[in-house]
Amino acid sequence: MINFINRYGAEIIQRATEHLYLVTVAIFIAISVGIPLGILVTRKPKLKKPILGFANIMQTIPSLALFGLLIPVPVVGGIGDNTAIIALTLYSLLPIIRNTYTGIVGVDPAITQAGIGMGMTDMQLLWQVEIPLALGVILAGVRVATVIAIGLATIAAAIGAGGLGVFIFRGVATVNNQLLLAGAIPAALMALAADFALGFVEARLSKSTLKTINDE
């Protein structure tokens, strides 16, 4: 084991950094797109079915197939990081859109009516009342999306995007369990760390939301 760490330790750190980069960029884009789409659905209910339907379809496509389908797409496709990031972003959209929608429509109508009674515009109501109260639910969606992205990012190695999946594919090709574990264990630890950190923030936000509601 010591010899293995001495031999592959530096590469494990390098691949973990690549893995984290892919996931971080993909989740940032998914948040930037998913939250506005979730808000849009609350304002335009007719768009709920097509938007959530598209996100659901993305979830049903096998991950390796989606990576492969994106390769020949002009501009965004090809071998490397860009294709992997786009694929991870598409997979991350559903929980973020769905939880944003659920969190906002789940705000107590009495609170929103009180805001309307105070003369708030729709935008003021959204930013000062609905989003603050829905943050815990929205973050839960981000949490799920992040864990999913960390797991799926291992497939990115198949299209030359690097990451911890390099060890996994190399281990499968050479029937080497040590290489498999060198990719699988850090990826699992990364997912657990992200889940714990975001879960902690989510719990704090939920407590803050309950306190706000009780104060009202």
Outline where the language-model segments fall.
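Glycine-rich helix-loop "coupling/hinge" segments at transmembrane-helix boundaries
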Residues: 72, 152-181, 185-187, 212-215
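Transmembrane alpha-helix signature in integral membrane proteins
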Residues: 11-40
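Loop-to-helix entry region at the N-terminal start of transmembrane alpha-helices
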Residues: 14-22, 72-95, 135, 183, ...
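Transmembrane alpha-helices
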Residues: 123-155, 182, 187, 194
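Cytoplasmic-entry segments and transmembrane alpha-helices of multi-pass inner-membrane transporters
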Residues: 37-70, 98-102
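Alpha-helical membrane-interface segments at transmembrane helix boundaries
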Residues: 6-21, 52-58, 71-75, 135, ...
